[in-house]
Amino acid sequence: MRKIVAIAAFVSACLVAPWAAAAPLQLFPSPVYVTLQGSDSVASLPGGARWNNLDSAHYVAVSPDGRQLLVSSASTENVFIVDAKTGKTLATIAVGAVPQGVEIGPHGWFGLAVSAGTDSVTVIDMRALKPVKKIIVGKTPHNAHFAADGQLAYVTLQGGTGAAVLDMRSLAKTGEIAVPGIHGPHNLDLSADGRVLWVRDLTGSVAAVDLRTRKELALIPVAPGHAGIDVIPGGRYVFTGGIAGHVVDVIDPATFKVVKQVDVGQGPHGVRASRDGRWLYVAVTATNKIAVIDTHSLKVVKQFDTHGKLPFWVAVRGNN
């Protein structure tokens, strides 16, 4: 009887969704992971596996070697470390009230988990599967992003006016970068050369900041509401959604202008490109779909039904 129960539990925790059969392999050069916040699960493409029992799966990051996922919970104070192959939860770590963004460093050693309710970021040893330090970063942090060499990390301060800078050698906050003109610094990314910080806000603006001079280079109006932001590999475009609208904005980083708006359906939030920069995956929250945009033609080439509720964030191996 115990064996039957164990098998049933495994099956319920790791299901293959019907969207797998409809996922052309050429659209997915590397694995893509999507949080289904309303279904307590993370789904993967192109294989179609879905891993359940992840309470209100909110943000997700994948390790550089593709072996681990770091997933935050919108309804508890926890983050989960998950085996990216089997879906097994390897560790559940308490990080404080209102967990938000998560990120794994370029070497795979450290993970970062943001707690908006405690104004902190928890540093996690991804090999030992344990927290190693909690860093107070500023008012209402939201998400984090590592520099390419892993020595620095940046954390948006949604309750402030910019981003905190963390030294990942000393595991300490070393300063803040002002981002004037935006309301609630929300999500972030770095340019391909690491010189420009891109910040998406809560209400419909994107700012670009020169990290050497700390000067704001541009303030760009985009779709309403909050969303993710992605400088695609190669740096040709910057994409951002807008959860209160229905389009993804395409920004030319050379001119800081929106060159196109791509209609994907109501509520686009998470955006992340394939590791080769050819495809953009968009979590469309109100339609429960994943839209795939061709970054050459800037057109939607496929819409996948997630067979889950509230697809929120997207992680792609090779594009952290």
Per-region residue spans from a language model:
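Bacterial N-terminal signal peptides that target proteins for export
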Residues: 1-8
